[in-house]
Amino acid sequence: MAVRVGINGFGRIGRQSLKAILERAPEIEVVAVNDIVDVPMNALLFAHDSTYGNFNGTVTHTDDSIVVNGKAIKVLQITDPTKLPWADLGVDIVIESTGRFTEADKARAHIDAGAKKVLISAPAKGEDITIVLGVNEGLYDSAKHTIISNASCTTNCLAPFAKVLNDSFGIEKGVMNTIHSYTNDQKILDVAHKDPRRARSAGLNMIPTTTGAAKALALVIPELKGKVDGFSLRVPTPTVSIVDFAVNLRDETTAAAINDAFRAAAAGSLKGILGVSDEPLVSMDFKGDSRSSIIDSALTMVIGGTGKFAKVLSWYDNEWGYSSRVADLTKFIAERL
């Protein structure tokens, strides 16, 4: 019997996650989405996307469902997750993508409503485990872990190549900066926001702000706790971001040796997660790339040619790459129910 999934929150990540599941894990049955937006608007936004173009399939709707490739997916409009009919719908896994229920105590409402597992598509608080595929999924224990976080898009970019660096050369200290596309948390025009910098127009400014990616790195690679910090620079592009990581290594090395380590991992244990690009590309060339992290090999540097201080830059589609991991992690959890 197919594993049944509900999606709570049908915004940017919720919609892309459904598309990724249809593409990457068609054996999983998405039976419902819950969102305050009405059915016709949900169908329209799923079918037509200003960033990625039109959905490669059919999308229609009824009074209470969107119909994707002939399969009806019920649309709910329930604000209290404890009242969601997950039990009646036989939902096994809920993808929590509203951004409102990232605390485990709040996300657990889906369990109370009848689901078996909750996958939070964001950094979480009090979760049973944070998983970055390719890095620490081996620690997952279905008997113990009910509330699972998929971390952030930036942590999913940083952690795989940080793992390679740490395993191969040792990380002593590092500072990361993500040059990150704007998100729905920002404003089109200047308006009040709890972060005074994010209060400014997303389309007109480069906006320094915070990121939890560096600290979250320690959740999946514990030996890096306290060794890495960083920030975010939001820029006026719709998707595709890049992590710029300056790092002091334990061992002396060269840029070529670092890139060779990345290539070996990308062809082996991190295949499909980590990539290496040798071409002189720009951000839009990575739009729609399903990998979590794509090293720009020409930008890898080691001061003096041989040394311990290095810089690595890695691209990621912060929407599609991340949503692909949501789909993959959903499949991973489903296979272990």
Where are these regions (language model features)?
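Short, solvent-exposed beta-strand edge segments and adjacent coil->beta transition regions
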Residues: 144-145, 201-203, 240-244, 309-311
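Generic structural signal for well-ordered, non-membrane alpha-helical segments
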Residues: 14, 103, 151-154, 158, ...
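Catalytic core of tubulin tyrosine ligase-like
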Residues: 170-232, 247
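Glycine-rich beta-alpha junction loops
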Residues: 36-38, 124-125, 152-154, 178-185, ...
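Short, flexible, solvent-exposed loop/turn segments with mixed acidic/basic and small polar residues
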Residues: 194-196, 233-238, 299-303
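C-terminal active-site/capping subdomain that shapes the small-molecule cofactor and substrate pocket
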Residues: 230, 242-337
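Predominant activation on well-ordered alpha-helical scaffold segments within soluble catalytic domains
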Residues: 18, 108, 159-166, 177, ...
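N-terminal Rossmann-like NAD(P) cofactor-binding subdomain of oxidoreductases
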Residues: 1-199, 304-305, 328, 336-337
